[in-house]
From Swiss-Prot:
Enzyme class at the top of the EC tree: oxidoreductase
Gene: srdA
UniProt remark on cofactor binding: Binds 1 [4Fe-4S] cluster.
Signal peptide positions on this chain: 1-39
Name the UniProt record assigns to this protein: Selenate reductase subunit A
Keyword list, A-Z: 4Fe-4S, Iron, Iron-sulfur, Metal-binding, Molybdenum, Oxidoreductase, Secreted, Signal
Amino acid sequence: MENQHQKFISRRNFIKTSALLGGTAFLGTGLPNIKKTYSKELDYVGNFEYPLAKPENILYSACLQCTVACSIKVKINNGVCMKIDGNPYSAMNLGENLPYDLSPKEAVSIDGKLCPKGQAGIQHAYDPYRLRKVIKRDGPRGSGKWKTIPYDQAIDEIVNGGNIFKDIGENQNVEGLKDIFVLKDPKVAKAMADDVTKIRKKEMTVDEFKAKHKDNLDVLIDPNHPDLGPKNNQFLFQVGRIHNGRIEFTKRFVNDSFGSVNWIEKTTLCGQTSNKAWVHSTREYLEGKWTGGIKSPRPDHRNTEFLLVFGSIVFEANYGPVQETEPITEGLESGRLKIAVVDPRLTKVASKAWKWVPIKPGNDAAFALGMIRWIIENERYDTKFLQNATRLAATNSDEPSYSNATYLVKVEKDGRAAKHLRANEIGIGTEKEFVVISNGKPAAVDPENSNLAIQGELFVDTNLEGIKVKSPLQLIKEEAYSKELAEWAELSGAKQKDIEDISKEFTSHGKKAAVEFYRGAIKHTNGWYNGQALIVLNHLIGNMNWQGGISNTGGGWSYIGDKEGQPYPMANLHPNKLSKFGVPITKEGWKYEESTLFEGYPAKRPWYPFSGNVAQETWPSISDGYPYKIKAALISSHSPMYSLPGGHVQLKTLLDTEKVPLLIASDIVIGDSSQYVDYIFPDLTYLERWATPGQSHHIRVKVNQVRQPVIAPLTENATVFGEEVPISLEALMMSISEKVGLSGFGKDAFGPGKDLNRMEDFYLKLVANIASGNKQGELVKAADSEEMELFKSSHRHLPKTVYDIEKWQQTLTSDEWKRVVYVLNRGGRFASSDDAYEGSFIKKKIPGLARLYLEEIADSRNSISGNYFTGYPKYLPIMDMAENLINDEGEFHLITNKEVFGTQSRTITNYWAQLALQPENFVVLNSVDAKKLKVDNGDKVLVTSTSNPKGEHLIAADESRPTIGKVKIVEGIRPGVVAISTHYGHWGYGARDIQIDGEVVKGEEVRGLGIHPNPLFRLDDNLRGTTLSDPIGGSASYYDTRVNIQRV
């Protein structure tokens, strides 16, 4: 640890530029004192004067070392963050959390739980390679040459454009953001948006649109295709890890002020297919439409008796280890819980399991359908639950929810299952009612009719009024019965007895069993159907909303002010807001057939009507100029070159100034992708900024942790709307707004007399909404004089650029301010862990149905193949977007994983965690395969694939490095499968030398150690430069690549 610490401090010896934190006096004089301060404070313990146990040295916030955003307790001395622990007020980080009304002075001695990443977040903030100043490329894109420029100059150049690179010999007139911001009139935007909706619904023709809007057609990208939207859409904001609060701030800028539809997150690189499959499988049917749905229900681990895990590393990643480990471990220790894990790799949780089944990657649906067959054959499904066709029927049978298992589905002449049959089609009701067979006769069903209690027959295959119909459970049965159990076992790579044993155990605990799954099951081209099959397993035992079953999160108090009586309804506090409209660059949320670009099949690129934030589609679409060109892009907290499968193929697009004439990044470092842009504006780390993240999927009570600045910002300051503030993403967006003249920022941004001049003017309103509660009588207490003094003293080290108490108070009313202080003193608002249940049920329920059939999916087509999707789970092999089989000849199947101490990029700075515990990753092989290859631990091997036959990782226009890693031999992986973890093998983030203002900044070799698997992943041969993807859920494929391995 001493050596690691000395390495960390010594960075100042070769970082000479003040553009980086390591070249400043702060690092040179501040960080060595951390070591001295630690030693000094240890001496204090015996004298009971330990400064980190004083309430005035504690601030509460929210982590961002992974997506979970744990509630954290930050301990500060002399303005320096010294220690990070879990917040004991929050049920996220202390199982039996402290009473919310307990004084922070009394809570100071109690710490909550936190993982290694969270505790190492100190080094994320104090990374010597952090950017402080704006830098502009001083050579071609990707040359590694930079120069610092004044903030105001950078804003002027990106807003006004022009020949802004003439000083380095480039003669290109670049359009500035003001030139792209063409549609400015809110009334015109609203009228056009409404009419584009009509075009989409085939209620208006393009000619009619053009005639109606003839005076404003010049604002459109293409008047012959008005559904592409205005030229404003040619500005793209692509973001990676971002949380609530900051999401709304950036959407306010991109969508509502600039009027672009292109706010694109990175979710398809994470769990989007899982999210969307659960949303559609838990929707309500209201006023003739399927609506709502819950993004990621999870097992109630505190009460589950049998947990079946597919492709989820519960103790190392997921949502997240801090929340899941304790109840699972308690269950194993007490004997309450039995676990089975279906995963090619022996994960930490698999090592504790009753059964570990090393499945073939991508064949989760085969295993699940084998289970479904066994469950149906042995009648181990919950008949009563599945038969309930209305909410009243469920209530009458003491069930908290019901299903659509009996809602009849029309079967077309070609055998395709289509939409649900409606009552009007056979003359027994309306078009908003479904049909079930009840007591041998068809009956009309309105699911939410409070006077209707109907139970339907589960297995139906008949004709009604000449219409062929089947029930959803019948369709699922037919798919499950399409193969013998032995065949399902062979496909999945499991033993038939394992399927039988697990099926029996799964159906032996009533409602207290659950299937949990994540990336390993769904990051495949067939990921949607894998996920849907696993969801159906939960539905078959009717475990939704029961203790020990599948449940909703506890949620929280609304931060956006959409509840009655809340003081700041943020959606309404934006005068002259623009109406965004048009097809996003990713074609997400649109059916190809409803666009004016429809020309039959295949489409030029995939469309994703059921997904969103399709990150891997962004840059290939930009490269192809389809559906339109992007003129300016701003990237934040996202690294497409590192995080995308096959991301290196996008390098040519990033380097091409014709493809994206203006490329900007907001980043804390010169990263693996931001190194290729034109300008980098420094951003704040999570210890210096605001957000209202929301809670983990695994907590059953309300949680609203608040991210707030706990250390002084380490970026330079800038003047925005007359206020001196730290340079950040928020400051950048506000400066652009000020320069361009966008609505929603500056004077009267929220309405007359309500300005948005500092980011706190926005974020404090969110906290005020949380303090107000969701209904009357839910106000938190107002801080008394003692708490007010504590608030002031605990913030004493923060400069006025982020903490100006007078200005903070001015943005709220006096009463709101006191309640906001009460919330901030505790790091958010938290319900008691005792508030999770109502009898045998989860208190905050999933409101919708358990849907076994998804008619909206069945009614849609693959935009490349033109074939319809299927509304129920089915087994599909791995295919490209055109539905060609992928049958590569590689000897090994490549998978990837995360370690508990690592995330994609930012943990490479964590000398106390990732770099101390495991400085590099490995090519992990089973001993059987190692013998075949004649390799041993530590041997170097070259890994190649069909899409990367030479094993080259392109990192610059004329530079690549080989995909070589060190071998690690284990027994806990399926023979024929090789695993390479992520978060290693960087070439930015301080890993390589760069030049700033003529000074060479030496890179640090340890940051580049290891092998990065993403350049090896299989690309779609029909879509140049795009990874294989799930056509429904939109997920990028991380587990469908075969590789060869050669000793070097």
